[in-house]
């Protein structure tokens, strides 16, 4: 292979990598020596705190980990980036939102469409077309305290039999990895490919913020009739737009 061919191959590989991780072809004229300097220069990484989604960085809101100015995905640990951050591990990413809109079509599971490497991915908001926020799908259970063992259903949890993934206080979906969670206490985070449509589709917007808390499902709070509802934009407290589910 001559030097010119090696040069072209190197740039082609770089462009494919950049597209796959950022979702767009970079402006080559902007790739100066400072393009990939970390946004947190001289700021200590805070691995003890959890990711906060969405977070605001340089005026834009992000619902997932990003690679802006970095080769490794990271997130802010404050709602507005103030120099506090951490590198993202698999269990730091937000959960998939199903259904989600991509290129005007509703999807109820992870898809490969639009991915050069045909890797499964999902949107982390109700509309990829609107927010362009996404992540690769986990195809196996991960995290938890059982070394990523697969879900076991049915299982006993709090003296009841459960048959599907459960939502915890951090909006993560988890599952028991033994037949009796009450006795064994073993669990994993659910694979994204195990999850299907859990919430209504358009016009609900998931997640949405109500009284400064994120919700990933329809809720009954704030209604006298105990009917469930959802916001149709991320910030209900600002926009006050909603529908019954």
Curated annotation (Swiss-Prot):
Domain Fibronectin type-II span(s) in chain numbering: 46-90, 91-139, 146-192, 199-245
Compartment(s): Secreted
CDD domains linked: FN2 (cd00062)
PANTHER family attached to this UniProt entry: SEMINAL PLASMA PROTEIN (PTHR22918), SEMINAL PLASMA PROTEIN HSP-1 (PTHR22918:SF3)
Membership in a protein family: Belongs to the seminal plasma protein family.
Gene source species: Canis lupus familiaris (Dog)
Gene: ELSPBP1
UniProt note on tissues of expression: Detected in epididymal duct epithelium, cauda epididymidal fluid and on sperm membrane (at protein level).
Stated name of the protein: Epididymal sperm-binding protein 1
């Amino acid at each position: 292979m001559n030097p010119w061919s090696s040069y072209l191959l190197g740039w082609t590989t770089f462009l494919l990598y950049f597209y796959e991780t950022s979702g767009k072809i970079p402006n080559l004229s902007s790739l100066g020596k400072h393009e990939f300097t970390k946004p947190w220069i001289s700021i200590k990484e805070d691995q003890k705190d959890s990711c906060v989604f969405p977070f605001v960085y340089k005026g834009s809101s992000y619902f997932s980990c990003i690679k802006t100015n970095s080769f490794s995905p990271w997130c802010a640990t404050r709602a507005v980036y103030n120099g506090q951050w951490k590198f993202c591990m698999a269990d730091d990413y937000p959960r998939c939102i199903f259904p989600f809109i991509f290129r005007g079509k509703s999807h109820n599971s992870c898809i490969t469409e639009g991915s050069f490497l045909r890797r499964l991915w999902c949107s982390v908001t109700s509309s990829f077309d609107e927010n362009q926020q996404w992540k690769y799908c986990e195809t196996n259970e991960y995290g938890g305290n059982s070394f990523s063992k697969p879900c076991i259903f049915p299982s006993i949890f709090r003296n009841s039999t459960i048959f599907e993934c459960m939502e915890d206080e951090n909006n993560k979906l988890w599952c028991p990895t033994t037949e009796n969670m009450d006795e064994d206490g073993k669990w994993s985070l659910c694979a994204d490919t195990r999850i299907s449509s859990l919430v209504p589709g358009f016009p609900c917007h998931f997640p949405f913020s109500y009284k400064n808390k994120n919700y990933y499902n329809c809720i009954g709070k704030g209604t006298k009739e105990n009917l469930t509802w959802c916001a149709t934009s991320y910030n209900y407290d600002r926009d006050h737009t909603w529908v019954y589910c």
